[in-house]
From Swiss-Prot:
It comes from Gallus gallus (Chicken). GO terms for biological process: regulation of canonical Wnt signaling pathway; regulation of Wnt signaling pathway. This is GSK3-beta interaction protein. The lineage of its organism: Eukaryota, Metazoa, Chordata, Craniata, Vertebrata. PANTHER family: GSK3B-INTERACTING PROTEIN. InterPro entries: GSKIP, GSKIP_dom, GSKIP_dom_sf. It is found in: Cytoplasm. Its main location: cytoplasm. Pfam families: GSKIP_dom. GO terms for cellular component: cytoplasm.
Length: 139
């Protein structure tokens, strides 16, 4: 992270320890939605045809956009905010203010409603992991 002060200025800082703790808490509380969006993509990419964070639509601390193509070839632009995830357009890198789709708390819930193939792939992956755990515990 870039700062506007030199290392010498940091050592001369006279703020109290309490103020410093409070500031650190506030900074840690701020989410970068682009990072959140990247984590979402990495989590479920295996179960969809294509998924990536939009480079066209603006990302900010409070919003990011994810393009999703399901295995059924449905294309969606998904908004990620503190409220959750929701479809904002039926194509990549678009938003349609007339859409009033509901928010989903998780990407799993969203994809479960959009893609029967996602449900199957995700379920199979879960089953394989459980079987692997069972084999590991028996050996």
């Amino acid at each position: 992270m870039e700062t506007d002060c030199s290392p010498m200025e940091l050592t001369n800082n006279t703020e109290s320890e309490e103020d410093s703790d409070y500031r650190d808490f506030e900074e840690a509380d701020v989410k970068d939605m682009r990072l959140e969006a990247e984590a979402v993509v990495n989590d479920v990419l295996f179960a969809v045809s294509n998924m990536f964070v939009s480079k066209t639509l603006p990302c900010a601390e409070d919003v990011a956009y994810i393009n999703v193509e399901t295995r059924e070839r449905g294309r969606y632009c998904v908004e990620l905010t503190d409220s959750g995830l929701r479809v904002v357009a039926y194509d990549f890198d678009q938003t349609d203010d007339s859409l009033q789709n509901p928010y989903h708390e998780t990407v799993y819930s969203l994809l479960d409603t959009l893609s029967p193939a996602y449900r199957e792939v995700f379920g199979n992956a879960l089953l394989q992991r459980l079987e692997a755990l069972k084999r590991d515990s028996q050996s």
